[in-house]
């Protein structure tokens, strides 16, 4: 059994670690609340854009924008959104597993894949994995802006415009609640049609464009893609802070359990040492 002094040192070390994890838990909780507010503030815009675009995809336009046209998938692109920092449980690895499974399915069908990665964890993972990373972005911090994402999104849109991509997806963690965050893959291009049954009927919905649809659609559809990627970044950030808070709480609780176990071992060691000393005193007295 280890000596009492050694056990005391271990207890002190674990207590120091526990203070760090507790502080990180509190910081993550504070950041989580702020990121949730940002996420909730941006959701109405992103949801409305998605709804409008879903209607456009069902519309009957004389001008058919390339983003509305279905074509055979020979090469697909993924915009993968991860965190910049670790210590957030299995948040990133679960996301990577999901996208890797889908990429494997495409590869088995002979479809090539391009990747744009946002977040240093995704950059490190796919550079190590060997994926064809054509754009990367990291260091967005806790207050990402749309302007910081335009370059990365623009690379993928340019490839789509030039016919080098036939599908474009965004991959990120979806914030369900503080206990549930799920990895999700959503199609950006070609534009997904509205799932509203009322809109599926012929001529159920159409817009009137003045003076003409082309310049409006050219700007609107690019803005739609950018808004969905931005919403993905904001949601992923909220998921990151929640996951880190939960991971640090678990670490703090585990440290408490270890301290209790070490304290028990320490008490036993101290008791054994006292018993040994008493035995030696009694033996000495008997000898005299």
Curated annotation (Swiss-Prot):
Q: Does the keyword Cell cycle apply?
A: no
Its membrane topology is listed as: Peripheral membrane protein
Alphabetical list of InterPro entries matching this protein: ATP_synth_F1_ATPase_gsu (IPR035968), ATP_synth_F1_gsu (IPR000131), ATP_synth_F1_gsu_CS (IPR023632)
Gene Ontology BP, a term? proton motive force-driven plasma membrane ATP synthesis
Write out the annotated subcellular location. Cell inner membrane
**Keyword annotations for this protein?**
ATP synthesis, Cell inner membrane, Cell membrane, CF(1), Hydrogen ion transport, Ion transport, Membrane, Transport
Family label: Belongs to the ATPase gamma chain family.
- HAMAP family in the record, alphabetically? ATP_synth_gamma_bact
Supply the NCBIfam families for this chain: ATPsyn_F1gamma, PRK05621.1-1
Q: What is this protein called?
A: ATP synthase gamma chain
Write down the species: Aliivibrio fischeri (strain ATCC 700601 / ES114) (Vibrio fischeri)
Q: Kindly list the organism's lineage.
A: Bacteria, Pseudomonadati, Pseudomonadota, Gammaproteobacteria, Vibrionales
Give the encoding gene's name. atpG
């Amino acid at each position: 059994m280890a000596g009492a002094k050694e056990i005391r040192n271990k207890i002190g070390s674990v207590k120091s670690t526990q203070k760090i994890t507790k502080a990180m838990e509190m910081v993550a909780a504070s950041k989580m609340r702020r990121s949730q507010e940002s996420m909730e503030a941006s959701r109405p815009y992103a949801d409305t854009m998605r709804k409008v675009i879903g209607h456009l995809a069902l519309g009957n336009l004389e001008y058919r924008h390339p983003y509305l046209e279905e074509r055979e998938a020979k090469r697909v692109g993924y915009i993968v959104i991860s965190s910049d920092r670790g210590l957030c449980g299995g948040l990133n690895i679960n996301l990577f597993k999901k996208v890797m499974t889908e990429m494997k399915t495409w590869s088995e069908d002979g479809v090539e894949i391009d990747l744009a990665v946002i977040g240093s964890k995704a950059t490190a993972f796919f550079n190590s994995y060997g994926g064809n990373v054509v754009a990367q972005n990291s260091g967005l911090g806790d207050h990402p802006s749309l302007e910081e994402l335009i370059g990365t999104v623009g690379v993928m849109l340019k490839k789509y415009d030039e016919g080098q991509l036939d599908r474009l997806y965004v991959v990120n963690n979806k914030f369900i609640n503080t206990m549930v965050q799920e990895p999700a893959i959503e199609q950006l291009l070609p534009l997904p049609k509205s799932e509203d049954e009322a809109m599926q009927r012929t001529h159920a919905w159409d817009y009137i464009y003045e003076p003409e649809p082309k310049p409006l659609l050219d700007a609107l559809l690019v803005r739609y893609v950018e808004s969905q990627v931005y919403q993905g970044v904001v949601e992923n950030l909220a998921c990151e802070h929640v996951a880190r808070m939960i991971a640090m709480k678990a670490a703090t609780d585990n440290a408490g359990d270890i301290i209790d176990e070490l304290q028990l071992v320490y008490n036993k060691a101290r008791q054994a040492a006292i018993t040994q000393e008493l035995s030696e005193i009694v033996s000495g007295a008997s000898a005299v």
